[in-house]
């Protein structure tokens, strides 16, 4: 599938990283991330992530299993930190500042679970006018945001771009592609 410019649609998948054995992502969230990646690839989209573990790894694995292309913006300069399912690796050496690249390197964003880093990526996308769809029931900030949004869909009073919600991997991917096709309003609110 192509975006508003005629290029392949890039969908960012953001969510919780598994940093160590004591910080796991639950099995249902991992399965949802896998399915989201698989569905994006099946529609001809490109999966963009931060390239590490957890949601990033599983969405990349799903995309690869469906024959898709995956891109990652790593926080470090070490290519070996990328998960095994990344095709195109960009080492940034930027630490968490790489969230700017992850959020801006896609036509729309899908949020699955997540902590403060994921929330940071979402707010960057929102501030830029880039559409985002949140998978409800996936834990973390994905399950907390709806109750605090302005009018149930905006991160602040500027009402830059609506944040959408979906209950299934199929619905979240459909909404993300539709949002990407509409073009959002990227770059208007930098």
Region locations from a protein language model:
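Phosphate/ribose-phosphate-bearing ligand recognition and processing surfaces
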Residues: 124-152
